[in-house]
Structures are given as C-alpha cells and as structure tokens.
C-alpha cells in the first residue's frame, strides 16, 4: 500500500505540474490508461489471498477516483482559461462605428412606369396586362394592320412560327380588354415589347405603355386634353405641345405628339436637333374597324388611344443620352436614381 500511496502522490504532482490539456491527457494515459500504472496495480489483485482482495481493491479504486477527480478539475481549469482567453480575443467593442449599409433604390425605368401609372390611375384609368408571346391576330389583324404592312416583316418582328410572335406593342392588351369588357373602358397597358432594332436610342426589348378610352361622345379634344395634362404633370412644368397629322392603321385620325424640348426650353439644341421640339408619343381616335372587330359598335361608341416608349420618357426626364445605360446594370449609373 505504501507503493500505492507513493504512486498516487506522484500522479497528483504530475497533474499539478501539467502546463496544458495535452500534457494532462498524457498523464491520464500514463496512470489510468489500459496499460497505466494504477491499472497495472489493479491487475496484481490476483496474486493476493482471497480475503485481502476486496479491501485492497477498494483502496485501489479510491486511489484511481482521487487521481481522476484532480485530473478532471485541472482539465476544467485549463478549459475555462482557454475560453476566457478566446472571449477576450473576440470581444466586440460596441463603441466602434458600425459597418454602413448601402440602401437600394428603384430602377429608373420602374420609377418612370410608376409615375405614368400613378397619373392615369388618379384620373380613373385601370391597369391592364397581357401575354408577351402573342398571336398574329391580336398583334396585327385585330388592329387593322394588313398583311402587306412593313411591321409584319421578319426584320422588325421576332416570330416563333407563322402565327406566334413576341408582341411588338402592348396594343393587343387593348384588343383583349375590348373583347372581354363592355364600354366604358379606361385602361393603360404597361409592359415589355420586342422589335428587331438596337442602337443608342433603340433596344430589341423595351417598355411601352399604351392608353385606351372607349365611351360615348368621345372626341379628339378629350384626347388632346388628356395628353397635355399628362405631359405637364410628368415633367412638372408647363410645356408647349403640338399634334402633327400622322398615320397608324389602328387609329383615324392619327397624330404624332411633339412637346417643347425640355433640355433647351424650345430654343434648339443637340437633343432636339435644333428644332426646339421632341417627339414623345403617337395617338389617335380608335379606328372603327378595330372597335368592330372587338365586338363594339362604332356607331354608338368612340374611343381614343395613345402609346409611348417608357425609356424615351425616362431619357428625357433624367437627361440620359444612351438608352443602353438602362440595361447595363452599372451601379455607378443606377445609384444616381436613389
């Protein structure tokens, strides 16, 4: 038993002198492992008389428990010290300024669309939408566009087959609305449209918004007043507006709308090509054939329609000279519109 006491004292001294958890583990294996010194003492019980084995075995177990207890306590102190050091190293200084967050913003095209929609919904128009993949009838036939019209050319329109295509305007939404609703109808139709064209002022995909009003006793003066008021509100200034006679298959009479150049106030500049005027939209009274093909009696109801390119208005409002900037996803450009 003197050897046992000496072995325990030796083990406890080793535990206290250990400098880290790895050293403790080596001490545990040396004294308490399968081939450890205290374990080997337990194996000598077989050499003792039977009557002494219980007593000696109990003493050995007490010795092992004592060493284990001290070893675990020492290990816990190391772990606590390690945790304390780690927390100190990772301490967050709450007095430091936080990391700034960059706030997002609406895309200028989205801003422009919302501004247009807001004006028309405030004066009683609804928002109508339709498919971007359209059939030939709704994109052309129902709008009084004959088969020989240049717009049907493969050079201007993206066809899937002889009957299906990417819509070239949002006018098909007007046709579908007239087919499904009875007058009075007051709608604007925003959406993406597709034409085979690409340069600094054109894109193969762009946004268009068209308007339609169908009711009794509607005339060109109603159309003129609506457009003039829209341009005044959209650009937030009084602008001279003129209507030039034009031709569209789906309206009669038809007109192109020019407004006083917002860049030079009509004095003449590079943007307006020294004319003082900017073309902003097309419009006209809905052709009787279009009303008739949509199931509306042109003798009882009249209507007007107009259409404008959203990118065109955004370029004029924000002073952007290259349409492609809207689609380059350059944050340096887009950040200006927050």
UniProtKB/Swiss-Prot annotation:
<dbReference type="InterPro" id="IPR004529">
    <property type="entry name" value="Phe-tRNA-synth_IIc_asu"/>
</dbReference>
<keyword id="KW-0479">Metal-binding</keyword>
<keyword id="KW-0436">Ligase</keyword>
<keyword id="KW-0067">ATP-binding</keyword>
<feature type="binding site">
    <location>
        <position position="252"/>
    </location>
    <ligand>
        <name>Mg(2+)</name>
    </ligand>
</feature>
<dbReference type="InterPro" id="IPR004188">
    <property type="entry name" value="Phe-tRNA_ligase_II_N"/>
</dbReference>
<dbReference type="GO" id="GO:0006432">
    <property type="term" value="P:phenylalanyl-tRNA aminoacylation"/>
</dbReference>
<keyword id="KW-0030">Aminoacyl-tRNA synthetase</keyword>
<keyword id="KW-0547">Nucleotide-binding</keyword>
<protein>
    <recommendedName>
        <fullName>Phenylalanine--tRNA ligase alpha subunit</fullName>
        <ecNumber>6.1.1.20</ecNumber>
    </recommendedName>
</protein>
<dbReference type="InterPro" id="IPR022911">
    <property type="entry name" value="Phe_tRNA_ligase_alpha1_bac"/>
</dbReference>
<keyword id="KW-0648">Protein biosynthesis</keyword>
<comment type="subunit">
    <text>Tetramer of two alpha and two beta subunits.</text>
</comment>
<dbReference type="GO" id="GO:0000287">
    <property type="term" value="F:magnesium ion binding"/>
</dbReference>
<dbReference type="InterPro" id="IPR002319">
    <property type="entry name" value="Phenylalanyl-tRNA_Synthase"/>
</dbReference>
<dbReference type="GO" id="GO:0005524">
    <property type="term" value="F:ATP binding"/>
</dbReference>
<dbReference type="InterPro" id="IPR010978">
    <property type="entry name" value="tRNA-bd_arm"/>
</dbReference>
<comment type="similarity">
    <text>Belongs to the class-II aminoacyl-tRNA synthetase family. Phe-tRNA synthetase alpha subunit type 1 subfamily.</text>
</comment>
<keyword id="KW-0963">Cytoplasm</keyword>
<keyword id="KW-0460">Magnesium</keyword>
<dbReference type="InterPro" id="IPR045864">
    <property type="entry name" value="aa-tRNA-synth_II/BPL/LPL"/>
</dbReference>
<dbReference type="InterPro" id="IPR006195">
    <property type="entry name" value="aa-tRNA-synth_II"/>
</dbReference>
<dbReference type="Pfam" id="PF02912">
    <property type="entry name" value="Phe_tRNA-synt_N"/>
</dbReference>
<dbReference type="GO" id="GO:0000049">
    <property type="term" value="F:tRNA binding"/>
</dbReference>
<dbReference type="GO" id="GO:0005737">
    <property type="term" value="C:cytoplasm"/>
</dbReference>
<dbReference type="Pfam" id="PF01409">
    <property type="entry name" value="tRNA-synt_2d"/>
</dbReference>
<dbReference type="GO" id="GO:0004826">
    <property type="term" value="F:phenylalanine-tRNA ligase activity"/>
</dbReference>
């Amino acid at each position: 038993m003197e050897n046992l006491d000496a072995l325990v004292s030796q083990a406890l001294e080793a535990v206290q002198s250990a400098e880290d958890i790895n050293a403790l583990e080596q001490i545990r294996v040396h004294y308490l492992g399968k081939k450890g010194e205290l374990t080997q003492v337990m194996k000598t019980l077989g050499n003792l008389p039977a009557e002494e084995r219980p007593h000696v075995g109990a003493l050995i177990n007490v010795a092992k428990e004592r060493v284990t207890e001290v070893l675990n306590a020492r290990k816990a102190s190391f772990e606590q010290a390690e945790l304390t050091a780690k927390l100190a190293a990772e301490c967050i200084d709450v007095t430091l300024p936080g990391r700034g967050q960059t706030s997002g913003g609406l895309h200028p095209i989205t801003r422009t669309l919302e501004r247009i929609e807001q004006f028309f919904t405030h004066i009683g128009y609804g928002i109508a939408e339709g498919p971007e993949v359209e059939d030939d009838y709704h994109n052309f036939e129902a709008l009084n566009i004959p088969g020989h019209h240049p717009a049907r050319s493969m050079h201007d329109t993206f066809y899937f087959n002889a009957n299906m295509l990417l819509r070239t305007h949002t006018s098909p939404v007007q046709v579908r609305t007239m087919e499904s609703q009875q007058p009075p109808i007051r709608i604007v139709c925003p959406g993406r449209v597709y034409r085979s064209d690409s340069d600094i002022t054109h894109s193969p995909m762009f946004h268009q918004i068209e308007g339609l009003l169908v009711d009794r006793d509607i005339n060109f003066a109603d159309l003129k007043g609506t457009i003039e008021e829209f341009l005044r509100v959209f650009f937030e200034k009084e602008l001279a507006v003129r209507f030039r006679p034009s031709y569209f298959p789906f309206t009669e009479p038809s007109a192109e709308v020019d407004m006083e150049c917002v860049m030079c106030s009509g004095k003449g500049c590079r943007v307006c090509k020294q004319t003082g005027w900017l073309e902003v939209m097309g419009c006209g009274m809905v052709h009787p054939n279009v009303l008739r093909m949509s199931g509306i009696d042109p003798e009882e109801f009249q209507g007007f329609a107009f259409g404008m390119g959203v990118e065109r208005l955004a370029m004029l409002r924000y002073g952007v000279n290259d349409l492609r900037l809207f689609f380059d996803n350059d944050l340096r450009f887009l950040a200006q519109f927050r």
